[in-house]
Amino acid sequence: MDLYPEENTQSEQSQNSENNMQIFKSENSDGFSSDLMISNDQLKNISKTQLTLEKEKIFKMPNVLSQVMKRAFSRKNEILYCVSTKELSVDIHDATGKVYLPLITREEINKRLSSLKPEVRKTMSMVHLGAVKILLKAQFRNGIDTPIKIALIDDRINSRRDCLLGAAKGNLAYGKFMFTVYPKFGISLNTQRLNQTLSLIHDFENKNLMNKGDKVMTITYMVGYALTNSHHSIDYQSNATIELEDVFQEIGNVHESDFCTIQNDECNWAIDIAQNKALLGAKTKSQIGNNLQIGNSASSSNTENELARVSQNIDLLKNKLKEICGE
């Protein structure tokens, strides 16, 4: 089965049924790609913390019923570990920070899922993003001053500050530059903009080095991720959010994503708890009703003051009408 089916493509698939492992390879004139998938059975030594709620501590029940309940509510943790790599040449016209490269796509994930048994495939609901290793290699001689900036962002996030997963700045004067980003979060396979979750932005500063149409560098990236049936299936190693290989320390540096400062605001407890709210996931309809809130907010006090002023004006208008009518 071809990973990226195209014309004039040489592809290879090898499978080790004993080890529950599959390797997909594809190569053509545009580049090379390879994918590795390993089932959870081969990685039982990886420790996982599960979210559990023991029925026996909630309900008082006979032993026989307790055993039946355990069987009824047991859930198998389905995990498929994947490593995907791809290589492509970049036109200097496209290396100016104006375009993005999606490092993981819905199409790729669907191809991974298509190799699973139907009963397992239908349970898969999450993708966990573990690590992204990026290698840039120049397509010109060594010794040319060619600064480059790279950022990996979650482009679903609207804030340009909060969308940053990691950034690196280096130079291709020595021919190559490499770094690793660790996103370490999971997302639903049903999220609308899945292809924008891992977006690579690159800015090649020496824009006059070549003309449009010339390939200035090669980007090779490797993404390690896991497909699971639960958001609670995966634990991540305690790595930094971004790392620069030791050999590149002198010619580059990295910038980690910022962790917010949480403000302990004890005054703001306003939350809408009105009745007749829409069901989560259902199509919303406009409703007119009373808004009941926990806590006092500035907006609610302002509304009360406005109502008082309106009431006063109505009383004044009423008195004026009485005077005009001679009452």
UniProtKB/Swiss-Prot annotation:
Stretches assigned to coiled coil: 297-327
Annotated localization: Host cell junction, Host plasmodesma
UniProt xrefs under InterPro entries: Caulimoviridae_Movement, Viral_movement
A GO-annotated cellular component: host cell plasmodesma
GO biological process: transport of virus in host, cell to cell
Keyword field: Coiled coil, Host cell junction, Host-virus interaction, Transport, Viral movement protein
Pfam families associated with the record: MP
Protein family (similarity comment): Belongs to the caulimoviridae movement protein family.
Subunit-level organization: Homotrimer, through the coiled-coil domain. Interacts with VAP. May interact (via N-terminus) with host prenylated Rab acceptor protein 1D (PRA1D).
Job of this protein: Transports viral genome to neighboring plant cells directly through plasmosdesmata, without any budding. The movement protein allows efficient cell to cell propagation, by bypassing the host cell wall barrier. Acts by forming tubules structures that increase the size exclusion limit (SEL) of plasmodesmata, thereby allowing viral ribonucleocapsids to spread directly to neighboring cells.
Record-given protein name: Movement protein
Source organism (scientific name): Cauliflower mosaic virus (strain BBC) (CaMV)
